[in-house]
């Protein structure tokens, strides 16, 4: 069985990690379907890393179609304990400019409830804590990694996750700004929630591509603009990830690693055997 302790999930513009040594393509299947694509597993800075393009190679999956449960479940099967998410985002703040990197510390859900957002269903219920959606340890590493890579980087801010795939209206953008949010994207949820349920530490490297549609001196966001900025910064994203991987202590502990300890409220005797089998890689230690 292939394994890795660190995972990287690449968003728009980051479809490969050419710095991986001895890369192997690994296809996995899960009880929740197939992941977005094959994993590329190799060595980076002396560590085993599993990379997955969130939208699939060729960008085939829109944000609502990304199989987040299959993706996170597969990372868990590989033994991943630390997951770095790289995402393209729009900025809702003047000082978070296109080309900058941001390490958000909060998240706000404005998806429409059409994306499956939990592993715990069909006879088992769990309520994980999610007050701090991003792992502080990994977020701090990403901050220092971005600085080491020479990026203009900002620490903190709330990332709003919208359903998409259309961009915001001006009214939506202005409302998000009035609420004090900093960034807007389409893919961090339910990914971050599922990572917490899978007891995987998770943090986001948000790469700003545009000012959404609120800025009076900038054109409204377009897909062409997003890809143009991402293409200009893909090497920077890869360098930040490389620096981050080098700093991660593979034996680190995070509150996320015990997120299910008091979260499963269904008594083991009442959980169907098929559900226990399906969730064994995620929660089996709590009812074995």
Curated annotation (Swiss-Prot):
Signal peptide: none
Transmembrane segments: none
Pathway assigned to this chain's UniProt record: Amino-acid biosynthesis; L-methionine biosynthesis via salvage pathway; S-methyl-5-thio-alpha-D-ribose 1-phosphate from S-methyl-5'-thioadenosine (phosphorylase route): step 1/1
Alphabetized GO MF terms: S-methyl-5-thioadenosine phosphorylase activity
An annotated GO BP: purine ribonucleoside salvage
Enzyme Commission number, as recorded: 2.4.2.28
GO cellular component term of the entry, any: cytosol
Residues that, per the record, bind phosphate: 12, 54-55, 87-88, 187
Superkingdom in the source lineage: Bacteria
Record's catalysed reaction(s): S-methyl-5'-thioadenosine + phosphate = 5-(methylsulfanyl)-alpha-D-ribose 1-phosphate + adenine
Similarity comment: Belongs to the PNP/MTAP phosphorylase family. MTAP subfamily.
Subunit field text: Homohexamer. Dimer of a homotrimer.
Name of the protein described by the UniProt record: S-methyl-5'-thioadenosine phosphorylase
Source species of the chain: Chloroflexus aurantiacus (strain ATCC 29366 / DSM 635 / J-10-fl)
Lineage of origin: Bacteria, Bacillati, Chloroflexota, Chloroflexia, Chloroflexales
